[in-house]
Amino acid sequence: MSEVLRRANNALSSVKQYQSLLNHFAATQSISKTKALHCHVITGGRVSGHILSTLSVTYALCGHITYARKLFEEMPQSSLLSYNIVIRMYVREGLYHDAISVFIRMVSEGVKCVPDGYTYPFVAKAAGELKSMKLGLVVHGRILRSWFGRDKYVQNALLAMYMNFGKVEMARDVFDVMKNRDVISWNTMISGYYRNGYMNDALMMFDWMVNESVDLDHATIVSMLPVCGHLKDLEMGRNVHKLVEEKRLGDKIEVKNALVNMYLKCGRMDEARFVFDRMERRDVITWTCMINGYTEDGDVENALELCRLMQFEGVRPNAVTIASLVSVCGDALKVNDGKCLHGWAVRQQVYSDIIIETSLISMYAKCKRVDLCFRVFSGASKYHTGPWSAIIAGCVQNELVSDALGLFKRMRREDVEPNIATLNSLLPAYAALADLRQAMNIHCYLTKTGFMSSLDAATGLVHVYSKCGTLESAHKIFNGIQEKHKSKDVVLWGALISGYGMHGDGHNALQVFMEMVRSGVTPNEITFTSALNACSHSGLVEEGLTLFRFMLEHYKTLARSNHYTCIVDLLGRAGRLDEAYNLITTIPFEPTSTVWGALLAACVTHENVQLGEMAANKLFELEPENTGNYVLLANIYAALGRWKDMEKVRSMMENVGLRKKPGHSTIEIRSNSVDTR
């Protein structure tokens, strides 16, 4: 370095020589030599406007924002080059407001420094990223008044800007007047249509591009394949894949990743795996795509096998990969595999990521390992909402209502702001508590914090009031939704129907159901279950049968085991056991334990030992460890005085090591909920 400065001291007698050396430092990204020469300029008293301008440009090209900014601001007058380089630097660093400020300063100098075809693309990008339509129109207006309105690089920047604004029609207007479109122009339109949800327009643009014989590049393929995946257009996706092979565009990993993702979105795991297996190089995105594909397909074993293969190949996972695998372990109740993933996350030093912490808490909760939930939570960041929401949801899932409410109070004390996900997890705890005073407290909180504007929160509160038996309050909230949201979704209708049903008000439940159908909301599986249950608990036999026939006639694809269970229960409560059994024999799939359980319960009520024994034997096969089935059959024998048969059933329970689980309840003592067991 000293030799460089010695030569500089001897040889640098002109500004051009300084500029030549600085240009070399910029080209080689040598920030240390630039700083040394900067020091030499200052100590040697050779500071001039031209040298300061070149130094600013050099720092900018080397990515040293602080020095570039300081020198630029100290210059009494900047050159066009320095303006352009500094604007570019700010845009590339994501400092869009700073880029616009420099542009405004540039424009304010008038004819001394006029923006050119290098300036406008970066300014248009800054406006687009800031989503400032007003600024974008000003920039476009200046471009049209300049000589650069027909410059294809400037026009391409305008296309991207308008697509960022979501103004696809304005982008298309610019595209249509372009005389010299290049592949970037077409790619910008395709990707812009995709990002703004105009899938068919993206397809049309791609077809037009191919018909115009434009040479496709990697960006074209990466822009087009997500469109095929979103539309689940497998044929088009395969055609694009064919073009990739014909034009030899598969050399970049981004293209192969896009192909894998497209086939996954189209539901073709086999073709996605075919591409995956033949990839010479795979990055973490590739692995994550395939693992997510298997998890969404419910194929836990293959997802975990890929995880093991990923570890073997030494690929470092990201948070999304591990969180996806942990979630699938939770859904499949594979706690041991979940623990292995937990250890892997620790070894890979990604354990402290909020996504992973949250997914681990949820996984352990689903696997009934609440102790491990709290262990993960104790080490998690308490400043983020995710872990709090997960631990509250885990407590509710495991019937730890008091713990869930306590955690929510602690969350608020520690000034962590709950979000709608937190409250969606919490409201079932208030419903399980069925305490009107507590329900009113959470209602007040939701109103004060503005969460009542959320349809999800309002639906949860309808359920809470329904469980408390305050159906007037539930219906009042239900009616208030109309004013805020203009329409009610099927989940909200279902909550109110369920509320009336659980309190034996079948007439109102059916009335709400029919009102829902008339309003144009399509019932789903859950709303039918709620309405049929309401009929069963209210003794509305004919109404329930009519509703069931309506479902089979108009919504046959929705019919599930739980709907048949409702009708068996309905007929059983009315003493029509033979009809209930005949219905079971007509079920188009294998009857589940809930169906036979409904019949057995009815047989206990009406002391029908023949059908009771038949139902019990089916249940012993389907769920041999359920003590309730043995108890119900024993109760039938006891009611008929068949004590020996009852003792045989009791002996069967003892032989398989079953014990009846004791019940428990929750009582309130001085505003605190206490679980009694």
UniProtKB/Swiss-Prot annotation:
Alphabetical list of InterPro entries matching this protein? E_motif, Pentatricopeptide_rpt, PPR_At4g14850-like_plant, TPR-like_helical_dom_sf
Gene Ontology terms, MF aspect:
RNA binding
Say yes or no: keyword Repeat present.
Answer: yes
Biological processes per GO annotation: RNA modification
Extract the ranges annotated as region (Type E motif). 595-670
Q: Where are the PPR repeats?
A: 48-78, 79-113, 116-146, 151-181, 182-216, 217-251, 252-282, 283-317, 318-352, 353-383, 384-418, 419-453, 454-488, 489-523, 524-554, 560-590
Q: Which Pfam families match?
A: E_motif (PF20431), PPR (PF01535), PPR_2 (PF13041)
State the source organism's domain of life: Eukaryota
The residues forming the signal peptide are none
> Could you confirm whether the keyword Repeat appears in this record?
yes
Q: Which SUPFAM superfamilies does the protein's record reference? A: TPR-like (SSF48452)
UniProt keyword annotations, A-Z: Repeat
Would you identify the family this protein belongs to, as annotated?
Belongs to the PPR family. PCMP-E subfamily.
PANTHER family registered for this protein in UniProt = PENTATRICOPEPTIDE REPEAT-CONTAINING PROTEIN
Q: What is this protein called?
A: Pentatricopeptide repeat-containing protein At5g39350
From what organism does this protein derive? Arabidopsis thaliana
